[in-house]
Swiss-Prot record:
Catalytic activity: L-proline(out) + chloride(out) + 2 Na(+)(out) = L-proline(in) + chloride(in) + 2 Na(+)(in); L-pipecolate(out) + chloride(out) + 2 Na(+)(out) = L-pipecolate(in) + chloride(in) + 2 Na(+)(in)
Transmembrane segments: 46-66, 74-93, 117-137, 215-233, 242-259, 295-312, 324-345, 378-397, 425-443, 459-479, 500-519, 538-556
Annotated glycan sites: 182
Protein's name in the database: Sodium-dependent proline transporter
Keywords assigned by UniProt, alphabetized: Amino-acid transport, Cell membrane, Glycoprotein, Membrane, Neurotransmitter transport, Phosphoprotein, Symport, Synapse, Transmembrane, Transmembrane helix, Transport
Any GO molecular function: L-proline transmembrane transporter activity
GO process terms (BP): glycine import across plasma membrane; neurotransmitter transport; proline transmembrane transport; proline transport; protein catabolic process; sodium ion transmembrane transport
Organism expressing this protein natively: Rattus norvegicus (Rat)
Top-level taxon of the source organism: Eukaryota
Function comment: Brain specific sodium (and chloride)-dependent proline transporter. Terminates the action of proline by its high affinity sodium-dependent reuptake into presynaptic terminals.
Length: 637
């Protein structure tokens, strides 16, 4: 038996050993797949890239607002519970898939080709998000350049873009010591700068007539794409070095903003508003749903970024440890960002003489209107404004690197012989194509299109993708087999906590989110603008398209097989004959592609019923693996 074990470990994994003679010629395998694919130059590259990917703009402009509107400090209870039930397990699952296979979001579905449509849906979603996400980075660049002046351009009224409604709110009273007659009808200089100068939204007649291209935004968008391209030019080799700055420097700026914020008069008022617990909110299902949504989107599960980054790891990288570092670090960063934001909002509310809830907003309104207005009230306002927008720039770029690397990796893994030698050129073509598709976002009505993309591109479709991935891995491939793969990779099997979450808790939570998003569906809007019916239909179709790619992929997989429908489904759900670790030295145990006493090699099949799946196939290799394990135990006694 020892000779048999040595033969298994010594035997090279070649295409001849992975298929029957009848199969040869039908399958083209890249045996040295990982040799020329590349890896991170260091373990810290991967960790910082994951932190940069997860810690993004949403941590600054979404989490604080969600927290204070859903019970303040009490919101942290469902937030951390959902992190444990949904966030950490799904994060670890996606990292495990990528690292074990060294494959991108498309090729990883060798694990079960029937579900390859889920990988295609990931690419569609991440592609749409990347188009509008870089437009947000372009807005940040615009404000960053505007901060390089002695006086911020949104500090005063009297500019050509201002209207008679513009009012410089310097306190609860006007210059004559009397309250304005109709404070609600006035507009701050920062709001008019954003809507009338940056967006020039008054030049649009709606989403159907977006107006002319704003060339200043067009150039900022071009610069954003040039920066992204240069940083991903050499794949993870280059982006992995850039994140040493872009993933760490935001924390320095956040710390500076936090220290400055808490020293302002009225800061404690804002912090109290942010964190004062209101436990009666926990009785509302909406609060729990909001917590789950925040976890789901902030960790970036389902976009393929985590899977892609992990695919460049060495086979034994400790992603279990990395999972907890990144997920808990992301949560702590969100909480700290809330302190930095609400301390300044508290100061702002005291200066204006209005309640905190009248100055608190979420999303672009916070980043491009409220916070810039607060900056004008500080000494050295251009300096603090520059720091704030530089922080947003680095936060946004990290996520954008992941989006583009996901697309490039997925396609090059599908066509390695054609695209991998020209990966830089292919990356450039992707950036050019997305820049051209994003030009509509630089028009007068571009914000309408951005809102539509933001509302629908990664909504219910993303939840369906993650549910499908979770069920395909745990129910079809098999939870026991998946845990065995992780044991081969990390040296231990996931415990009951992870198994229970993967099998029941995480899919159930995601299903609840999906049902909630459908039941509570509300049409898109931007300010007072209501989107026309055709735009709503377009958005819904956008979300449905990613969902439909899953059954479409199933249909293609089934049509490629032979036999009855049930036989086709069985065959399509089997792992591909070359599924497993990409490097020969890591293909041990059940992945050693020879069978004891066999004259001719056979494909490596998976005993799915024994390992938790729904199909059953012969696999003598598992019996050999069991015998080897038993002999090892006897030798240790």
């Amino acid at each position: 038996m020892k000779k048999l074990q040595e033969a298994h470990l010594r035997k090279p994994v070649t295409p001849d050993l992975l298929m029957t003679p009848s199969d040869q010629g039908d399958v083209d395998l890249d045996v040295d797949f990982a040799a020329d694919r590349g890896n991170w130059t260091g373990k810290l590259d991967f960790l910082l890239s994951c932190i940069g990917y997860c810690v993004g703009l949403g941590n600054v402009w979404r989490f604080p607002y969600r927290a204070y509107t859903n019970g303040g400090g009490a919101f942290l209870v469902p937030y951390f519970l959902m992190l444990a039930i949904c966030g950490i397990p799904l994060f670890f699952l996606e990292l495990s898939l990528g690292q074990f296979s060294s494959l991108g979001p498309l090729a990883v579905w060798k694990i079960s080709p029937l579900f390859k449509g889920a990988g295609a849906a990931m690419l569609l979603i991440v592609g749409l998000v990347a188009i509008y996400y870089n437009m947000i980075i372009a807005y940040v660049l615009f404000y960053l350049f505007a901060s390089l002046t002695s006086n911020l351009p949104w500090e005063h009224c009297g500019n050509w873009w201002n209207t008679e409604r513009c009012l410089e709110h310097r306190g609860p009273k006007d210059g004559n010591g009397a309250l304005p007659l109709n404070l609600s009808s006035t507009v701050s200089p920062s709001e008019e700068y954003w809507s009338r100068y940056v967006l020039h939204i008054q030049g649009s007649q709606g989403i159907g007539r977006p107006g002319e291209i704003r060339w200043n935004l067009c150039l900022c968008l071009l610069l954003a794409w040039v920066i992204v391209f240069l940083c991903i030019l050499k794949g993870v080799k280059s982006s992995g070095k850039v994140v040493y700055f872009t993933a760490t420097f935001p924390y320095l700026i956040l710390l500076m903003l936090l220290v400055r914020g808490v020293t302002l008069p009225g800061a404690w008022k804002g912090i109290q508003f942010y964190l004062t617990p209101q436990f009666h909110h926990l009785l509302s299902s909406k609060v729990w749903i909001e917590a789950a949504l925040q976890i789901f989107y902030s960790l970036g599960v389902g976009f393929g970024g985590l899977l892609t980054f992990a695919s460049y790891n060495t086979f034994h990288q400790n992603i279990y440890r990395d999972t907890f570092i990144v997920t808990l670090g992301n949560a702590i960063t969100s909480i700290l960002a809330g302190f930095a934001i609400f301390s300044v909002l508290g100061y702002m509310s005291q200066e204006l003489g209005v309640p905190v809830d009248q100055v608190a907003k979420a999303g672009p309104g916070l980043a491009f209107v409220i916070y810039p207005q607060a900056m004008t009230m500080l000494p050295l306002s251009p300096f603090w404004s520059f720091l704030f927008f530089f922080m947003l720039l680095t936060l946004g770029l990290d996520s954008q690197f992941a989006f583009l690397e996901t697309i490039v990796t997925a396609v090059t893994d599908e066509f390695p012989y054609y695209l991998r030698p020209k990966k830089a050129v292919f990356s450039g073509l992707i950036c050019v194509a997305m820049y051209l598709m994003g030009l509509i976002l630089t028009t007068d009505g571009g914000m309408y299109w951005l809102v539509l993309l933001d509302d629908y591109s990664a909504s219910f479709g993303l939840m369906v993708v993650v549910i499908t991935t979770c069920l395909a891995v745990t129910r079809v491939y098999g939870i026991q087999r998946f845990c065995r793969d992780i044991h081969m990779m990390l040296g231990f099997k996931p415990g009951l906590y992870f198994r229970a979450c993967w099998l029941f808790l995480s899919p159930a939570t995601l299903l609840a989110l999906l049902v909630y998003s459908i039941v509570k569906y509300q049409p898109s809007e931007y300010g007072s603008y209501r989107f026309p019916a055709w735009a709503e239909l377009l958005g819904i179709l956008m979300g449905l398209l990613s969902c439909l790619m899953i059954p479409a992929g199933m249909l293609v997989a089934v049509l490629r097989e032979e036999g009855s429908l049930w036989e086709r489904l069985q065959q399509a759900s089997r792992p591909a004959i070359d599924w497993g670790p990409s490097l020969e030295e890591n293909r041990t145990g059940m992945y050693v592609a020879t069978l004891a006493g066999s004259q001719s090699p056979k494909p490596l099949m998976v005993h799915m019923r024994k390992y938790g799946g729904i199909t059953s196939f012969e696999n003598t290799a598992i019996e050999v693996d069991r015998e080897i394990a038993e002999e090892e135990e006897e030798s240790m006694m």
